[in-house]
Amino acid sequence: MAHKKGASSTRNGRDSNAQRLGVKRFGGQTVNAGEILVRQRGTHFHPGANVGRGGDDTLFALAAGSVEFGAKGGRKVVNIVAVEA
């Protein structure tokens, strides 16, 4: 049985917390203004109609309505189809 831990065993044993990224509201779901739609690193999804983009590239709803995913110019976009008031 070894009485020393070994060269690298004391330098291991670390892990970072998950960042909880991804789509939070899917196509067809109804949302209110300010709700987070997508958490992402970089612009995998781009903001479309009634959607804003935060400093960390998070997409959020600017108006109440239903979520719609689509493409425009080869980019994936997220739109909010506003509810008729």
Swiss-Prot record:
Belongs to the bacterial ribosomal protein bL27 family. It comes from the Bacteria. Residues 7-19 have a biased composition (Polar residues). GO terms for molecular function: structural constituent of ribosome. This is Large ribosomal subunit protein bL27. Residues 1-22 are annotated as: Disordered. Gene3D superfamilies: 2.40.50.100. InterPro entries: Ribosomal_bL27, Ribosomal_bL27_CS. Pfam families: Ribosomal_L27. One of its GO terms (biological process) is translation. NCBIfam families: L27. One of its GO terms (cellular component) is cytosolic large ribosomal subunit. Keywords: Ribonucleoprotein, Ribosomal protein.
